Design a protein with these regions (language model features):
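A generic structural motif
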Residues: 70, 77-79, 86, 102-104, ...
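Short, conserved beta-strand element in jelly-roll/cupin
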Residues: 51-55, 65-83, 121-124
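Short acidic-glycine-tyrosine-enriched beta hairpin
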Residues: 86-101
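Short histidine-centered beta-strand/loop micro-motifs
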Residues: 38-43, 61-66, 108-110
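A short, N-terminal "cap"/entry segment at the start of jelly-roll beta-barrel domains
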Residues: 1-46, 135-161
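Conserved short histidine dyad/triad with adjacent acidic residue
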Residues: 31-36, 50-66, 101
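Ligand-binding loop in jelly-roll beta-barrel domains
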Residues: 101-127
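Short, charged, solvent-exposed linker or helix-capping segments at domain edges/interfaces
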Residues: 128-133
Length: 161
């Protein structure tokens, strides 16, 4: 059995250049042995489990939908706002929600304390993301990283902040 304790999973802080997007993540699946840089299914887990914390006034990332990935969320603490095709809804500790492929969404924190949740993603090999607000695509190019295109390759945060 592979086992980790959250206290020993490294926390990684990420922030966009303009500061609109910020989060701290703990990649639990990576701590359990998933190779985040491999496309080899033997080195990947069938799903990813990540603990995410969004500070007050920030969003996780731009409004987007995945071409292949499904994501299941479970709110642990704080309050968050979830934007989807129907508008914006508040979520609180204990709430669970799901987005399948093609369902655009964005998670934000408009509260006064961190908004913390688990996300479980089914980790498909060749996912892509579409960003409706900026009409961009993130596509994989035989690597674990995405390239961002809008007719031609562009910066991830262009027209997002």
């Amino acid at each position: 059995m592979k086992k980790v304790n959250l206290a020993h999973v490294p926390a990684e802080q990420r922030q966009s250049p303009g500061g609109k997007y910020a989060k701290t993540i703990k990649e639990i699946s990576v701590a359990l042995g998933r190779d985040p840089h491999s496309l080899d299914l033997a080195k990947r887990h069938p799903f990813d489990l990540t603990l995410v914390s969004i500070p007050p006034g920030k969003s996780y990332c731009p409004y987007h939908c995945h071409g292949a990935e499904s994501e299941l969320y479970l709110v642990i603490s704080g309050r968050g706002m979830v934007r989807d095709k129907d508008g914006t809804s508040e979520v609180v500790a204990g709430d669970a929600f799901f987005f399948g492929p093609g369902e655009a969404h964005q998670l934000s924190n408009n509260g006064t304390e961190d908004f913390t949740y688990y996300v479980i993603a089914d980790n498909p090999r060749h996912d892509s993301c579409y960003y409706p607000d900026s009409d961009k695509w993130a596509v994989s190019k035989e690597s674990p990283d995405y390239i961002i295109v809008r007719g031609t390759e562009t910066d991830y945060y262009k027209d997002e902040e």
